């Protein structure tokens, strides 16, 4: 029985390892143009600023002669109050830990403006920068947008280090200065049919080398009718490498992707904060002059990436912890940090790939006990032209599934983690890979739209309900492209609907009310801190807000709350107790109403998992569902529509079947909702069956194999009956009477009278006064006549 339980555990674990999806990003193509940032001016009296300054920064773009103005303010969201940096030694042990002082990092956000010929300024986009040097000759890096075309500002030294062979060369101007390139300056890959061609290797985010990717049903047509056919086997024989992409974990059907395009239902109405952790490995740290510079670059990357999440999902990405490893890579990777090694240093030969780094880093992340949304490993290594890799739909997931084995390249560990390689547009790679962790699939491009494995354009996010190709304009584009600064309406609808359906976790997302920031109390940072009634941001952001005074962060006269930051606030007054602040999503998720004396909406409460909510339906993660219903939702289009049922009731991977073909198993990188019943009396949790017991496992196995059990029971019963019958028959035979010789009966004579005997009886001795000696129980001789006894004793016949 112990072995049986162990076997079930192994099978369940192995099955769970085919439920998630990884996504990988590839390096950009060559640059057609690059500009130098000329005449930068900080518009303050002394040309000096500090980390908490509000100021304008202007400069020219040579040779375009365009004047740009960045209107900037501190971005206090990028660092949490207790943000810290931990310095590790080469063995992975903690050397020291320091608090990240907000005043040491001049990180800013704001708006980009262009100057017309008339001299008037027009706002054309957003800006996120980090200032390295102020004064008369400032030096900064970051990104800003002009009409949705991103402009990347980088230092000359960084460009030289990461310059592609066919990028424009630089002149011999000495010293450090700033360069700029646009997304539209990147050479675009040309494609003809299914063959992609470019001067550089194809820049894409394909996810076809790890088992999680290969097991994705949403990249394949229906399976051929074979017993126990799996997506993995079908993939190995029918789909080429370049025809794949990832699916982002638990993906709604094609109808759902189209129906939710542009919908923000499910995303937070008020600002939420996602705390993240970042680790810099030795190869990444080695690209900087100091550990301080490495830390600043990480902050700059998160600062730039956060803006697209704030605009799309009302979620800020905030650094909670940074771990920095020494720049000298160890000769042999430590068991504590196996991901920290040279790019081509893998035991047993070959290269230590980006997938290897993700696996080992995920195992490391799984041991962390924090409440971070995810962790990112920053590295300077790539695999061919791949520069990013992430597990999909792992937001807020704690722990790890699986275990990487250095001797087995196919072994995987899945956690809330990703890997990002250092490039000159790292922030985009970071934002793209984080999008997969939030559960986004790729946007459709021309290749996916023409792929026969993508019927009805259901395996990617289409541009509209009637148009497939998104033309490479958005953050989840599978290949590099220009003007990528936002998520597509389809990606927004998908992520928000996943939050609403609870197919991704959001428990780690915190509110921005009562959050302590690294800088302490700062009015105007958009976070309501101790001592503040409200905080709508700077004066530009607070335009039209009549509830909050942006200068004092106090309610205006007569106001009780702030409509922009409190869900139970209407017209600066508390909403009535009959006001619904969070609607019901079904029988298992009751609506929440305002209290009438607070601006906050009560906590979201849903029915207990396992409660009955309909015929053959139970609550799971706030949804009224069943295993069959989830199969119909996720794989119905590929199997049998509304007739689709679950293949079994044991595991937590979505495995379905057509009742007319019960031996054909349809599966993919899908998991049942948390709280869905699974084998052994357990429930699904992050794709694994937890809470099962050995007794229930045995009972469940019996119920799932009734024909076998009945056959064995009948056979054993018959054998038992035969054994009992045999015993009864044997006992009956032993009790039957039989003719047999009777043993002689010796009787002690009483005063016998010997007639015809000569002398005394045989063997007799003369009596003595002391009594008689014992008799020897010897019968009389056969020929001797029997003795005569007095009385009428019956005679005994000896035979």
Curated annotation (Swiss-Prot):
The protein's required cofactors: Zn(2+)
Cofactor: how bound: Binds 1 zinc ion per subunit.
Cysteines engaged in disulfide bonds, as pairs: 396-496, 449-460, 581-601
Residues carrying covalently attached carbohydrate according to the record: 33, 227-228, 314, 408
Residues making up the signal peptide according to the UniProt record: 1-23
Broad class of enzyme this protein falls into: hydrolase
One Gene Ontology cellular component: membrane
Positions of Zn(2+) binding: 432, 436, 442
EC number: 3.4.24.-
GO BP annotation list: proteolysis
Transmembrane annotation, as ranges: 708-728
Membrane topology reported for the UniProt record: Single-pass type I membrane protein
Positions on the Cytoplasmic side per record topology: 729-799
Any one GO molecular-function label of the UniProt entry: metal ion binding
Compartment(s) where it occurs, according to its Swiss-Prot or TrEMBL record: Membrane
Function: Probable zinc protease.
Full protein name: Disintegrin and metalloproteinase domain-containing protein B
Species, as recorded: Arthroderma benhamiae (strain ATCC MYA-4681 / CBS 112371)
Lineage: Eukaryota, Fungi, Dikarya, Ascomycota, Pezizomycotina
UniProt gene name: ADM-B
């Amino acid at each position: 029985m112990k072995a049986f339980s162990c076997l079930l555990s192994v099978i369940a674990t192995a099955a769970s390892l085919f439920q998630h999806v990884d996504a990988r990003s590839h390096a950009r193509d060559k640059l057609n143009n690059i500009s130098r940032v000329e005449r930068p001016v900080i518009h303050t009296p002394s040309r000096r600023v500090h980390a908490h300054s509000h100021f304008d920064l202007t400069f020219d773009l040579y040779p375009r002669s365009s004047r740009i103005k960045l209107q900037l303010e501190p971005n206090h969201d990028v660092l949490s109050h207790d943000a810290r940096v931990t310095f590790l030694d080469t063995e992975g042990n903690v050397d020291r830990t320091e608090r990240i002082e907000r005043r040491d990092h001049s990180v800013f956000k704001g708006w980009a403006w262009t100057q017309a010929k008339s001299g008037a300024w027009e706002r054309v986009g957003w800006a996120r920068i980090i200032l390295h040097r102020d004064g008369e000759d400032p030096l900064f890096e970051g990104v800003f947008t002009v009409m949705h075309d991103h402009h990347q500002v980088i230092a000359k030294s960084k460009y030289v280090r990461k310059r592609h062979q066919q990028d424009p060369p630089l002149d011999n101007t000495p010293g450090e200065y700033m360069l700029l390139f646009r997304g539209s300056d990147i050479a675009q890959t040309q494609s003809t049919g299914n063959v992609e061609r470019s001067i550089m290797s194809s820049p894409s985010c394909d996810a076809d080398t790890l088992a999680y990717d290969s097991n994705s049903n949403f990249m394949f047509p229906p399976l051929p009718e074979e017993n126990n056919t799996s997506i993995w086997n079908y993939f190995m024989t029918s789909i080429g490498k370049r025809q794949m992409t990832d699916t982002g974990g638990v993906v709604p059907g094609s109808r759902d992707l189209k129906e939710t395009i542009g919908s923000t239902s499910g995303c937070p109405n008020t600002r939420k904060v996602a705390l993240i952790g970042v680790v810099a490995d030795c190869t990444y740290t080695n690209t900087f002059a100091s550990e301080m510079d490495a830390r600043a670059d990480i902050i700059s990357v998160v600062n730039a990436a956060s803006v697209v999440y704030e605009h799309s999902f009302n979620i800020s990405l905030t650094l909670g912890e940074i771990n920095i490893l020494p720049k000298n890579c160890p000769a042999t990777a430590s068991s504590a940090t196996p991901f920290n090694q040279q790019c081509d240093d893998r035991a047993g030969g070959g290269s230590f790939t980006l997938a290897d780094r993700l696996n080992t880093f995920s195992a490391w992340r799984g041991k962390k006990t924090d409440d971070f949304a995810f962790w990112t490993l920053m590295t300077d290594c790539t695999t061919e032209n791949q520069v990013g890799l992430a597990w999909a739909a792992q937001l807020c997931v704690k722990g790890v599934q699986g275990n990487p084995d250095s001797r087995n390249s196919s072994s995987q560990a899945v956690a809330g983690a990703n890997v990002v390689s250092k490039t000159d547009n790292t922030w985009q790679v970071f934002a793209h890979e984080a999008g997969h962790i939030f559960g986004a699939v790729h946007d459709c491009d021309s290749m996916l739209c023409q792929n026969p494995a993508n019927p009805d354009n259901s395996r990617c996010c289409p541009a509209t309900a009637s148009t497939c190709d998104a033309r490479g304009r958005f953050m989840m584009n599978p290949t590099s492209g220009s003007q990528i600064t936002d998520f597509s309406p389809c990606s927004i609808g998908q992520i928000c609907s996943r939050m609403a359906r609870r197919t991704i976790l959001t428990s780690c997302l915190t509110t921005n009310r009562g959050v302590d920031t690294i800088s302490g109390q700062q009015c105007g940072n958009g976070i309501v801190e101790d001592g503040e009634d409200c905080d709508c941001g700077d004066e530009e952001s607070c335009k039209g807000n009549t509830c909050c005074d942006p200068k004092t962060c106090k309610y205006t006269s007569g106001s009780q709350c702030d409509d922009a930051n409190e869900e139970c606030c209407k017209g600066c007054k508390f909403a009535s107790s009959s006001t619904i602040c969070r609607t019901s999503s079904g029988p298992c998720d009751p609506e929440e109403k305002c209290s009438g004396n607070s601006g906050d909406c009560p906590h979201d409460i849903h029915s207990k998992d396992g409660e009955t909510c309909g015929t053959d339906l139970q609550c799971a993660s706030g949804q009224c569902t069943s295993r069959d219903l989830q199969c119909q939702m996720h794989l119905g289009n590929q199997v049998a529509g509304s007739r689709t049922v679950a293949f079994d009731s044991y595991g937590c991977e979505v495995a379905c079947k057509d009742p007319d073909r019960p031996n054909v198993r349809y599966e993919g990188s899908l998991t049942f909702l948390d709280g869905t019943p699974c084998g052994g009396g357990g429930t699904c949790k992050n794709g694994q069956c937890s809470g099962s017991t050995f007794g229930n496992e045995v009972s469940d196995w019996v119920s799932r194999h009734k024909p076998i059990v009945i056959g064995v029971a009948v056979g054993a019963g018959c054998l038992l009956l035969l054994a009992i019958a045999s015993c009864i028959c044997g006992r009956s035979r032993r009790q039957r009477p039989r003719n047999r010789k009777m043993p002689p009966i010796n009787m002690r004579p009483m005063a016998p009278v010997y007639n015809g005997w000569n002398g005394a009886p045989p063997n007799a001795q003369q009596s003595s006064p002391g009594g008689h000696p014992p008799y020897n129980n010897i019968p009389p001789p056969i020929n001797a006549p029997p003795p005569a006894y007095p009385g009428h004793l019956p005679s005994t016949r000896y035979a």
